[in-house]
Structures are given as structure tokens and as C-alpha cells.
UniProtKB/Swiss-Prot annotation:
Gene encoding the protein: dnaK
UniProt feature, compositional bias: Basic and acidic residues: 490-509, 529-542, 599-614
Keywords for this protein: ATP-binding, Chaperone, Nucleotide-binding, Phosphoprotein, Stress response
InterPro entries in UniProt: ATPase_NBD (IPR043129), Chaperone_DnaK (IPR012725), Heat_shock_70_CS (IPR018181), HSP70_C_sf (IPR029048), HSP70_peptide-bd_sf (IPR029047), Hsp_70_fam (IPR013126)
Name recorded for this polypeptide: Chaperone protein DnaK
Alphabetized Pfam families for the sequence: HSP70
Gene3D superfamilies with a match to the protein in the record: 1.20.1270.10, 3.30.420.40, Actin, Chain A, domain 4, Substrate Binding Domain Of DNAk, Chain A, domain 1
Assigned protein family: Belongs to the heat shock protein 70 family.
SUPFAM superfamilies: Actin-like ATPase domain, Heat shock protein 70kD (HSP70), C-terminal subdomain, Heat shock protein 70kD (HSP70), peptide-binding domain
Role summary: Acts as a chaperone.
Matching PROSITE patterns: HSP70_1, HSP70_2, HSP70_3
NCBIfam families: PRK00290.1, prok_dnaK
Amino acid sequence: MSKVIGIDLGTTNSCIAILEGDEPKVIQNPEGARTTPSVVAFKNDETQVGEVAKRQAITNPNTIQSIKRHMGTDYKVDVDGKSYTPQEISAMVLQNLKSTAEDYLGESVDKAVITVPAYFNDSERQATKDAGKIAGLEVERIINEPTAAALAYGLDKTEQDQKVLVFDLGGGTFDVSILELGDGVFEVLSTAGDNKLGGDDFDQVIIDHLVAEFKKENSVDLSKDKMALQRLKDAAEKAKKDLSGVSQTQISLPFISAGENGPLHLELTLTRSKFEELADSLIRRTMEPTRQAMKDAGLSSSDIDEVILVGGSTRIPAVQEAVKKEVGKDPHKGVNPDEVVAMGAAIQGGVITGDVKDVVLLDVTPLSLGIEIMGGRMNTLIERNTTIPTSKSQVYSTAADNQPAVDIHVLQGERPMAADNKTLGRFQLTDIPAAPRGVPQIEVTFDIDKNGIVNVTAKDLGTNKEQNITIQSSSALSDDEIDRMVKDAEENAEADKKRREESDLRNEADSLVFQVEKTITDLGENISEEDKQNAEDKKEALKSALEGEDIDDIKAKKEDLEKVVQDLSTKVYEQAAQAQQQAQGEDANASQDSNVEDADFKEVKDDDNQDNQK
């Protein structure tokens, strides 16, 4: 099988790697650099890509940068009367990388693994695939950047399960992902970030500082001069990189401008501490998504086993220190953060060609899956974005006494009410032995295989009888449908909350009616006729209210019945106490040997009994 190249198609820089033997190797571009700027420029009917395009970004209006931000949208770029889609611009970057790989390998390259941020939706991923196709590449797999980074660090080779935090501060975007690794399986637990924060912002604070200092000294505003701004940008980027290794750097830009008395030069010493002061607000902005990602994954910093840094801006010592302080662990520094994602993509290429074994590539469920339960609610078993294959079981029971069958209504969607979600299928589990409500144990299992085929099984744990349904292509929804359903869930959150509260109220009221009926039966002759009639009246009033739509009436009748239940419980308690005291008076020894928990009624010195009271 021909080579499958790994491509990190970044917002500001891209990188390409290939698997040589067992090791990924980054391929240098013709200029000798290991990364290529994701910049395209049009000049004199010529298309330029990479460093040459970046160098004239400010002075040439036909220069396109950060096109990745627009992938999956209908955004267009107009250049000299011609429109280009984000896919076409990205394809030009990919063609450049493809050409670099072909020059290195000495053969044509037509297969690639391309990485995308973990938060990319289906349309953004599809747009990335389309860009590869335009560039003449068959995109074998689109994989998540944090997964690729974890692969490059060899974390799939560890024996025990691990939770990994991937801190990715690129040129134009920032995101944090939490991954769980085990048995070669990579699962993205959560992702958070800021797509308007990156290395460019760190350059900008230096540029702003240089402009302010120069203006203070010379009364000249360099931000109004395009040529000067291009030189400032290059100098700021270099200074930022220098300060990752040294405590201060000299910025020297002769003939940057001209004043009344001749040429003006910019000479300034920038210390690391001053840079950290300028960038402090940016560094603090990275911490909130870091905390959010851990919160969404249900983890604290102590649960994180490894921290991986991705992106050139993570070389900034203050960034590394902030991550260490927040997570409480030293980040991994074994792999170049600019190259780690491309190297992981190359390893995935090796998985596809069969050169790399024991790594499982996973897809995810685009929407939550569950069943309808009492009150017309959807009870979710498998959450949206769960990696597949997966399996989940939950035990349910009957809603009525002597219920002979249960209907299993399989649903897909994000809304709390069953009627608002998509029906995938229905089936029935029959011949349930007669029993009071709540007694039968019905286990419902959702099983999704690697192809996304859902198998739902309902099993009566008492008789071991089971019934199932197989649903082909559970994710056969258009992107528009998925987007609409998620959007509906957001827009209707308040209305859904009210309906959910109503459903909860009705379920609680229904349970209360059942509880009162059972209590009256259990008490038998121990309840007075007056109390019994009062309870029956209040119970019937609540049942009648449940048949209507007046929520306030249901609430009021439920509270009335709850008070009756409380009064009954108090009387039962008092009767039990009196009976207990009589029994103690008649036979103290029998009382001590009794299994009745009487700790509430007399002082007990024994330590174990004291524990039982707590």
C-alpha cells in the first residue's frame, strides 16, 4: 500500500509528517523549515503559499490568512473578481504540502490523514475532506488533533488507563481537550477553548508595546504605516520566540520611519518579565477553558495523569508555569509542540496501512440515544458525542400493578420530552409475571457497534425473557437535522424546563397516590375510620386533579395529601412506640434480644448501636 502522509492543517501554520519504519518523521519544506505558514497570496496572476506569502501579508491586500476559521461555512474570498471558498484556499496549502512530501519521497502521494480540532462539527470535517480532494488527496481519515498529539507521545503504549489534558495554544486558536486512554482506545471526554486566542495575540501585545514606546519617544504612530507594521510584526514574532530561551532580547529596526530631522530607528530591549506582564491577560484567558474542560469531563486536577502541550506558543515559560499551577503537574516536553499533531497523524496513517497495530480509531454518536419513560420523558442512556463502539444498560420497572407488558420506544435527540425527539423504533417485552408496580426488573441495554448500528435489548431479570430491535444507521440524519435538533434544544430550554417540572410533579403525585393506597392497606385496623376517610378523600381529589391540566391545582392537592401522609406516619410512629414500651414493661429481656430498632426511644451506650443511629 502506498504511503499515507499525516497533515496538521493549522490556522496559522501547517506541518507534514510520514512514518519511516516505526517512527514518524517531519518533512522539511524547500526553505528548510519544518512548518509552513497557512497563508495564500495572489500577486501578478501568481499564487504564493507559505513563508513567501506571509512576508507580504500586510502590504498585499490579496493575502489570505486563518482560512481554517471559515471551514464549513458559506464564506467566500474575492480576489480580482474571482470568488474562492475556504476549501479551495485550504486546498492550495495542502497542494503545497503534498508537493513537499512528493519531493522528499521521490514518488507521488495521494493518500493522507488530516487533523482537525476536537470541537469541529460534521460540516467542518467534511469541508476539510473536500479540501483534500481538491488538492488531489484521498483523505483516509479525519482525526482529532488532541488524539494525534497523544499518539505522538506514545501514550497508547502505556499499560494502565490514563486521563490526559491536551493544552493546544496555536497561532490563531486555543483549545483544551481531556482524553481517556486505555487498551489503545482514545476517547475525547470534553473540549473547551477560545477560537479568537493564539500566538498572533501574543505577537500583537509586543507590537502594541513597540508602537507605544516609539510614539512616546518620537511622536510618530507606526501603526499607520503598513511597511513599518510588517517589520514590527516580524520583529515581535522573533522577540517572542527569543524570550522562550533567554531573559531579554534586543529589538533593532533601523530606518523604521522618518521625522523632520531625518530617518528614525527603533532600538529597544524587551525583557521576559516585561513580556509576561504584557501577556498576562492572555495567559489568564487560557485558564478558564482549562477549568471548563475538566469540569465538563467530571474531573479535578488531581485526576489528570498527563499534560501535553501543543502549539508553538506553549513554549512561552509563563504559559507552561500557568498550566503547571492550574493542573498541578509538569507538562510533557518530549516532542516539538509545533510538530506533535502532524506526527500523530502520520502514526494514524501507519494504522491504516497496517504498519501500526493495536490502536483503535473511534467514531462518535452525533445525538443522544434513549427510551421514553413515564410522563412522556426521554431517559438518555447514551449521551451525544459518546465514542463508539459502546454499550450501556439501565434497569427500569413497571408503572402499574400487574402490568403484563412494557413498550420500549427508542429515541434520538437532545430534548427532555419524548415527543420532541426522533423515533428510531419501537418494540414490546411481553409476558411479564403479575406483580405490584415497581417490582419487576426490566433491564434495557443499548449496544452500538463500530459501524454505528444500534441494537436495543429489553430483558426481564425475573424470567430472563428478552426482546430486541436492531436499528441500522442510527446517525442517518442530515447535518441540518442535527444542527436543528441541537439548536431546538437550546432555544426551547425554558419551555422544556417547565414541561420537565410538570412531568416530575405528575410522577411524584402519582407515586404519592400509590403510597397512600399501600399505607392504608398495610395499616388495616390500626387506622381510625375518620383518618382513613380523610386520606381516601384527599387521594381521590389528587387523582381527579391529575386528570386535568391545572398544575397549581395538582400542586395544592398533592400538598394536602402529603400532610395527611405525614399525620398518618406520626400516628403509626406513636402507636409503635406505645406498643414497644408495653412490650418492654412486660419482658425487658425479650426487648434486648429483639431485632426491632429501638435506639430512638432509649439511651444506648453501645458504640455500634450509636453508629446505627447516625
